Amino acid sequence: MEGPQEREVPAAALAAVLKHSSALPFETAQVRGYDFNRGVDYRALLEAFSTTGFQATNFGRAVQQVNAMIEKKLEPLSEDEDQHADLTQSRRPLTGCTIFLGYTSNLISSGIRETIRYLVQHNMVDVLVTTAGGVEEDFIKCLAPTYLGEFSLRGKELRENGINRIGNLLVPNDNYCKFEDWLMPILDQMVLEQNTEGVKWTPSKMIARLGKEINNPESVYYWAQKNHIPVLSPALTDGSLGDMIFFHSYKNPGLVLDIVEDLKLINTQAIFAKRTGMIILGGGMVKHHIANANLMRNGADYAVYINTAQEFDGSDSGARPDEAVSWGKIRMDAQPVKVYADASLVFPLLVAETFAQKVDAFMPEKNED
């Protein structure tokens, strides 16, 4: 027969399970996703990401952060502030927020190239930082296409057939042969101008020259040189471009690329900016090069990272924005965002919710070539 105590729930268990809550701050948002009973409305769907939770909410915060950059960028400068433009060593006018865009080479290999080209075409960003592959793949795509494949294709069979794999993208090796045919005469001309006219080449000057030579409006760097947007690539020799420069050095030696002048260029872009924003797709060199330039001004005002890297191995690629705050690369009062996601999925949606909504404000007479 049960006693009275055996019929009562233990007080400790009740207290643990039914613990009362303190009130949350009044402004705390409620979780709520998109209701498809409203029909298919993509703008409303993306807006609902903010209150969906997880990486959808981080995406919503990234939209807010980029829109804050754009709002400040479009603010008119005072006469005194406008005079700082001469100090940046750039042919671009100073704005209320200088936007740095960094991206790894695989994104140019992918269809994100077209999204980046759109931003550059319409003067929406001020400084680009990428790797060698992020430069050469743009030009190679003007000469021959990249194809869709599968992640699972076997390397041995691809190598036997002269096909290179980038994730689930395929690049025939003939594309690089076409790239060599196009590039070698330009390298000859660069050496000639260096020796006869005293031209001091830097990676950014070389990229601008190649953008002019390709003369193709599908190219990111065609628009970059046309809109005087500097492209910094301190590791420019680490890829097919480096292979071609290496081969060329046997045929016509002497080409010199000065990375120190470019270092001064990117750092002064940050130092003399009224405000700065960083949008960084992927990690590695492009992430750190932009962040380190912003150290020169005690940190960026705005920052958005999009990558899938984790911080637990201590890599810069995986480091959260708060680590950059500790180094003075993002300001202590900033509200940076990291979206843990594949940029090929997220970045076009981010542009759709930010820059693309304000295209007329950036370029009243649209560049369409």
Curated annotation (Swiss-Prot):
Binding site for NAD(+): 105-109, 131-133, 137, 238, 283, 308-309, 342-343
Binding site for spermidine: 136-137, 243, 288, 314-316, 323-329
Entry keyword set: Hypusine biosynthesis, NAD, Phosphoprotein, Transferase
UniProt-listed Gene3D superfamilies: Deoxyhypusine synthase
Record: active site: 329
Top-rank EC class of the record's enzyme: transferase
Residues recorded as bearing Phosphoserine in the entry: 78
SUPFAM superfamilies referenced in this protein's UniProt entry, alphabetically: DHS-like NAD/FAD-binding domain
This protein's pathway: Protein modification; eIF5A hypusination
Cofactor: NAD(+)
Enzyme Commission (EC) number: 2.5.1.46
Gene Ontology cellular-component terms listed: cytoplasm; cytosol
GO-annotated molecular function: deoxyhypusine synthase activity; identical protein binding
InterPro entries: Deoxyhypusine_synthase (IPR002773), Deoxyhypusine_synthase_sf (IPR036982), DHS-like_NAD/FAD-binding_dom (IPR029035)
Reaction equations catalysed: [eIF5A protein]-L-lysine + spermidine = [eIF5A protein]-deoxyhypusine + propane-1,3-diamine
A single BP term in Gene Ontology: glucose homeostasis
Family membership: Belongs to the deoxyhypusine synthase family.
Protein function: Catalyzes the NAD-dependent oxidative cleavage of spermidine and the subsequent transfer of the butylamine moiety of spermidine to the epsilon-amino group of a critical lysine residue of the eIF-5A precursor protein to form the intermediate deoxyhypusine residue. This is the first step of the post-translational modification of that lysine into an unusual amino acid residue named hypusine. Hypusination is unique to mature eIF-5A factor and is essential for its function.
Protein name per the record: Deoxyhypusine synthase
Gene that encodes the chain: DHPS
